[in-house]
């Protein structure tokens, strides 16, 4: 995965720079997400790693994407096809999303709770994280009954384990040492 990220980084950075320059960051995010989905399609995958000429591959890919990709996006597809890099489009899309979140001062936070959180609880977590991180927070909530009670919050490098399972694990470690 690290290798794909290394390969994808210059393409994502170039796309992001163009998107910012043309005030089209959201449009580019949608285009790259769509192109990534096309590249992951079971019919398309073998073509991306096959021996199809780069110009034909780019033309085919662009025709499949249709109106979803503008002229600048098509140019990116052509360059990536020429370099045999269309298979890294999902990583390009992911990196672009990270650049976008950083630029917009946003962070995604994964919140795992033992029981489903009410909208009020989600709002309280969001407000607390926004104060702590000085960024706009988008919550991705899920449940895991194995936590017993409480929540685990992951936002970037920050991990807050407020679950009973986590507390029991830490207590067990202290008792064993």
From Swiss-Prot:
Keyword entries, A-Z: ATP synthesis, Cell inner membrane, Cell membrane, CF(1), Hydrogen ion transport, Ion transport, Membrane, Transport
MF term (GO), any: proton-transporting ATP synthase activity, rotational mechanism
Source organism, top-level taxon: Bacteria
Membrane spanning residue stretches: none
Gene Ontology terms: cellular component: plasma membrane; proton-transporting ATP synthase complex
Pfam family, one: OSCP
Topological relation to the membrane, as annotated: Peripheral membrane protein
Localization (cell): Cell inner membrane
InterPro entries: ATP_synth_OSCP/delta_N_sf, ATPase_OSCP/d_CS, ATPase_OSCP/dsu
Annotated SUPFAM superfamilies: N-terminal domain of the delta subunit of the F1F0-ATP synthase
GO BP terms in the entry: proton motive force-driven ATP synthesis
Cited NCBIfam families: ATP_synt_delta, PRK05758.2-2, PRK05758.2-5
Alphabetical list of PANTHER family matching this protein: ATP SYNTHASE DELTA CHAIN
Function: F(1)F(0) ATP synthase produces ATP from ADP in the presence of a proton or sodium gradient. F-type ATPases consist of two structural domains, F(1) containing the extramembraneous catalytic core and F(0) containing the membrane proton channel, linked together by a central stalk and a peripheral stalk. During catalysis, ATP synthesis in the catalytic domain of F(1) is coupled via a rotary mechanism of the central stalk subunits to proton translocation. This protein is part of the stalk that links CF(0) to CF(1). It either transmits conformational changes from CF(0) to CF(1) or is implicated in proton conduction.
Sequence similarity: Belongs to the ATPase delta chain family.
Self-association and partners: F-type ATPases have 2 components, F(1) - the catalytic core - and F(0) - the membrane proton channel. F(1) has five subunits: alpha(3), beta(3), gamma(1), delta(1), epsilon(1). F(0) has three main subunits: a(1), b(2) and c(10-14). The alpha and beta chains form an alternating ring which encloses part of the gamma chain. F(1) is attached to F(0) by a central stalk formed by the gamma and epsilon chains, while a peripheral stalk is formed by the delta and b chains.
Name of the protein this chain belongs to: ATP synthase subunit delta
Organism: Shewanella oneidensis (strain ATCC 700550 / JCM 31522 / CIP 106686 / LMG 19005 / NCIMB 14063 / MR-1)
């Amino acid at each position: 995965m690290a290798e794909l990220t290394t390969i994808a980084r210059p393409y994502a950075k170039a796309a992001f720079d163009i998107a910012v320059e043309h005030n089209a960051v959201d449009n580019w995010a949608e285009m790259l997400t769509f192109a990534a989905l096309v590249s992951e399609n079971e019919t398309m995958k073998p073509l991306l790693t096959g021996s199809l000429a780069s110009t034909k591959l780019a033309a085919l890919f662009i025709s499949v994407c249709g109106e979803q990709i503008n002229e600048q996006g098509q140019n990116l597809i052509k360059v990536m096809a020429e370099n045999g890099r269309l298979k890294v489009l999902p990583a390009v899309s992911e990196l672009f999303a990270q650049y976008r979140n950083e630029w917009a001062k946003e962070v995604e936070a994964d919140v795992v709770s033992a029981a489903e959180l009410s909208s009020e609880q989600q709002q309280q977590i969001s407000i607390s994280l926004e104060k702590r991180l000085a960024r706009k927070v988008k919550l991705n909530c899920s449940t895991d009954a194995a936590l017993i009670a409480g929540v685990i919050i992951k936002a970037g490098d920050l991990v807050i384990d407020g679950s009973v399972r986590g507390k029991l694990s830490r207590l067990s470690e202290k008792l064993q040492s």
